[in-house]
C-alpha cells in the first residue's frame, strides 16, 4: 500500500493508477516528461508526471493541476530556499496563496474559514505540494525534514486571496 511504501503523510491517499495519472496530466498543457526543477533535499528531477502522481494521491481534480504545477515550480525557485525550510528545526512549512480568475474557476474558498475544512481545492492543492516534496525530493520527517515539532502546514496550506474585494483594499 501507499502507507507501507511511506508515500503518504499519514492520511489516506487516492491510489495513483495509470488511468488516474493520465487524467491528471490532461488537466494541463505541460508534457509529462518536462522537468520543473530539482526537488530538495535529494535534488531529484521533479517531472510533471511525478507531480501528477502526487496530485492524484492528494485527491486533486485535473482542473486543479495547473495550480499545483505552479506551486511546485515556485517552491523550486532557489530564492524560496525549500532545502532550508526542510533543514530547519523550526516549525515552518510551505504556504500557497492563489489569486486571479483560476480561484473561482476551480472553486477555491477565499471568503471565510479559508484554512479550515470543507473545500477540496484548498485542501488538496496544498497537500499535493507537500506530498511532492516528500515523495519526489525525499523531505520526510525524522529523516531529512528536521522540524522539531512539525506543523499543520506540512500536510497542506493553501488558500485563495480576496484582493478583488474593495473593502479590503488600502486607500
Predicted features, each with a name:
Residues 98-102, 112, 129-133, 155-163:
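Short, structured patches in soluble enzyme cores that scaffold and shape functional sites
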Residues 2-87, 94, 108-147:
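Alpha/propeptide regions of enzymes that mature by internal proteolysis
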Residues 148-155:
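Beta-rich nucleic-acid/ligand-interaction surfaces
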Residues 166-171:
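Conserved small/polar residues in nucleotide/adenosyl-binding loops
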Residues 89-103:
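Long, compositionally biased
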Amino acid at each position: 500500500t501507499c502507507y507501507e511504501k511511506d508515500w503518504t503523510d499519514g492520511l489516506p491517499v487516492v491510489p495513483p493508477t495509470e488511468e488516474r495519472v493520465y487524467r491528471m496530466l490532461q488537466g494541463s498543457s505541460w508534457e509529462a516528461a518536462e522537468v520543473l526543477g530539482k526537488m530538495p533535499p535529494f535534488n531529484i528531477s521533479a517531472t510533471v508526471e511525478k507531480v501528477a502522481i502526487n496530485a492524484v494521491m492528494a485527491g486533486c481534480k485535473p482542473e486543479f493541476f495547473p495550480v499545483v504545477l505552479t506551486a511546485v515550480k515556485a517552491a523550486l525557485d532557489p530564492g524560496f530556499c525549500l532545502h532550508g525550510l526542510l533543514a530547519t528545526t523550526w516549525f515552518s512549512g510551505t504556504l500557497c496563496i492563489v489569486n486571479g480568475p483560476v480561484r473561482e474557476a476551480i472553486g477555491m474558498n477565499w471568503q471565510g474559514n479559508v484554512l479550515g475544512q470543507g473545500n477540496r481545492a484548498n485542501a488538496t492543492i496544498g497537500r499535493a505540494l507537500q506530498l511532492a516534496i516528500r515523495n519526489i525530493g525525499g523531505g520526510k520527517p525524522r529523516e531529512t525534514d528536521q522540524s522539531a515539532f512539525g506543523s499543520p502546514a506540512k500536510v497542506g496550506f493553501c488558500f485563495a486571496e480576496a484582493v478583488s474585494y474593495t473593502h479590503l483594499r488600502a486607500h
